[in-house]
Amino acid sequence: MEAIAQEIQKLHANTDEAGRGKINHDLSVLLASFDTDWEKILKLAAGPLRLALVKVGVDQGIFHALNERSHTLPELIEKTGVAPYLLERILRGQASFGMIKEEGAKGFAANRFTTLLAGPNTSGAVTYIFDILRPIASAIPGFLSERNNPAITSTHDTVFQRAFNTELGGFEWMTGHPEHYGNLFQFLALRPNCEWVDAFPIEAEIGSFTNDPHVEKVLLVDVGGGTGAQSVAFRKKLPHVKGRVIVQEIAETLIHVGAKAPAGIEFMEYDCFTPQPIRGAKFYYLRYVMHLWQDERCVEALKVIITAMGPESRLIIDEAVIPDRDVPWQAACQSILMTAALAGAERTLTEWHNLLDAAGLKILNIFPYDLNMQSVIIAVPK
């Protein structure tokens, strides 16, 4: 078995991202085939507990403590204040799920997963998963059972309202609970840095757009760009290309930028359903925006951008383009949650063509760039 494991590790280390994804998938299928029916049921039962143990480890500082050094059970009891008999069971459970590792009879230490769970953004990410995503997922069965027509057509009539006992839409509710915005941004910050700017020939697209030395044009308008991470990636990719880079966001999000605004990036308060003040920019960039809404709302926002585009402008949509079958689990989960929480959706290639056509746009090219079907879609007005 050790020789087999070493061979798999060697293959995993020496292949590209697509190859690693296939290895991971094939191994998951193989391992699942070994489970008995009862083991499959037990794993379902363990799912909620696994998340709860992660939350406990974050809240009680267990992962941080072990990431600094190994601890004995008495040391962790003193550090956390949790009752000895309960903490010992929690630690054993965390070790059984691979969150930490056991050392000797009563000792515990960090592993790779512990280090991740002790990371700077993980606390907010885990809290967001536990406080927001978990209740939404739990409310889906009841939502479907109670409705004769379970179609979700409005942001005010989704699983979110049932999960949080509110009549407000998801983002309206979040505005009244700003701590969750901060947790959301920490969650999103953990995504792998597969850079959209490396996915297509971006300098060829810019061409001679910025050649006029007397005019500083706008290179990028990052619509709904959060705290500017993608604009920073754009600047790093093209430090030698002059031109303004502007992030547009709602006020509730800009609060989280504050004095930490990245150098060379402008921030502007903006609602994407109001007239676009930046006209004739080279790129109007939307990342994880269209999947928040159903088609009608997307068309409305896209038409606003079209009115601001010049003859050299390009619309860039950075989102998943999912296949009609064999969808990766990551994209499938995200699609379900977007629909359940916000009446949004991840879209197939056909759905993207139909959506952009309805808005008055045509797709010039699509560049996939990761295993979750994340893609750069380049479009222009018809």
Swiss-Prot record:
GO terms for biological process: methylation; secondary metabolite biosynthetic process. Its EC number is 2.1.1.-. One of its GO terms (molecular function) is O-methyltransferase activity. S-adenosyl-L-methionine binds at residues 249, 287. Signal peptide: none annotated. Pathway: Alkaloid biosynthesis. It catalyses: 3-desmethyl okaramine B + S-adenosyl-L-methionine = okaramine B + S-adenosyl-L-homocysteine + H(+). Disruption phenotype: Abolishes the production of okaramine B and leads to the accumulation of 3-desmethyl okaramine B. The active site is at residue 291. Pfam families: Methyltransf_2. Keywords: Methyltransferase, S-adenosyl-L-methionine, Transferase. InterPro entries: COMT-like, O_MeTrfase_dom, SAM-dependent_MTases_sf, WH-like_DNA-bd_sf, WH_DNA-bd_sf. It comes from the Eukaryota. Belongs to the class I-like SAM-binding methyltransferase superfamily. Cation-independent O-methyltransferase family. O-methyltransferase; part of the gene cluster that mediates the biosynthesis of okaramine B, a prenylated indole alkaloid that possesses an unusual octacyclic ring system, including a four-membered azetidine ring and an eight-membered azocine ring, and that exhibits insecticidal activity against silkworm larvae. Within the pathway, okaF catalyzes the last step which is the methylation of 3-desmethyl okaramine B to produce okaramine B. With okaG, OkaF is also able to produce okaramine D from okaramine E. This is O-methyltransferase okaF. It comes from Penicillium ochrochloron.
